[in-house]
Amino acid sequence: MDLFNAAILALIQGITEFLPISSSGHLILTPYLLGWQDQGLVFDIAANSGSLAAVMLYFRREVGQMLRGGWRLLCAPRAWRQANAESHLVLQLALATIPVGLVGLACKDWVATVARDPMIIATTSILFGLLLWWADRQGRCNNDGSALSWRQVGIIGIAQAFALIPGTSRSGVTMTAGLMLGLTREAAARFSFLMAIPVGILAALLDLKDLFAHPMQGDELYFLGVGFCVSGLSAYMVIHGLLAWLKRQTMTPFVVYRVVLGVVIFATLG
C-alpha cells in the first residue's frame, strides 16, 4: 500500500461510515474494482478508530453523560432501578449493542469470508436502500428521540445486527428502524451515531489481539497514522453535514445512490 491508496481508503471509510450507504461494502469493493491489494486488518483498525474518535469528539457532551451515567450505575446499587437521564442513556446503548455483539461473535467467520462477496453487497445495497426509502416516506416521523421505550431501543438494536452483512450499512439500517418507529430523521441519525460508540469500542477491543500480533515497522505506522487522521477528519465533517441535511431534506439521494451502486455491481460483475 502506498500513501495515495491509504489516503483514498481512509477517506472512503470516513465518508461512508456515517452516511447510510455502507462503509464496509465500499472498502471491500474499492480494492476489488481498482485491482489494489487488500489493505489488511491493521489498516482497517486504524481507519475505523479514526471514525470512532470523530463521533466521540462530535458527541463529546453525550460521551461525558455516558461516563457519568456508567459510573453512577457501578457505584449506586439502586441506580439500575432509578436511572437518571445519564444512566438511562447508558442502559439504552448497552441494550442496543447486545444483539450485534452476540450475532457478531456467532457469525464472525461467515461475515469475514462468505459475506464479502460483491453480489451480496449489491443485493443488500438495493434491498436495504429500498427499505430506507419506504421508512422515510411513511410520514409518521415526529418523535424527537427524547423518550425512546425499551421496546424501540431493542428493535433498533436488532436491526443493527443486520449491519454485519457488508452492503447493509450500520447507520442506514438503524436509521431505517428509527424512522419505522416514528423518529424524526435527525433523531434517528443522532441515536444511530451514538450507537456507533459502544459498537466501535467493542470492535476495537476484539481486534486488539490481532493488532498486537502484527509486528509494525516505521513506514507502516506512518500509513496507519494517515488512515486514522484522514478517516477521523472526514467522518467528523460528514456527521455535522448529515445532521444539518436531515433537518430539512430526505433520505432519497442516499437511496438512489444505493440502488444505482447495486445495479452497477450486478452489471459489471454479474
From Swiss-Prot:
Pfam families: BacA. The keyword Hydrolase applies. InterPro entries: UppP (IPR003824). The chain crosses the membrane at residues 1-21, 39-59, 87-107, 114-134, 147-167, 193-213, 223-243, 250-270. It is found in: Cell inner membrane. One of its GO terms (molecular function) is undecaprenyl-diphosphatase activity. Its EC number is 3.6.1.27. Keywords: Antibiotic resistance, Cell inner membrane, Cell membrane, Cell shape, Cell wall biogenesis/degradation, Hydrolase, Membrane, Peptidoglycan synthesis, Transmembrane, Transmembrane helix. It catalyses: di-trans,octa-cis-undecaprenyl diphosphate + H2O = di-trans,octa-cis-undecaprenyl phosphate + phosphate + H(+). PANTHER family: UNDECAPRENYL-DIPHOSPHATASE. Belongs to the UppP family. NCBIfam families: PRK00281.2-4, undec_PP_bacA. Catalyzes the dephosphorylation of undecaprenyl diphosphate (UPP). Confers resistance to bacitracin. This is Undecaprenyl-diphosphatase.
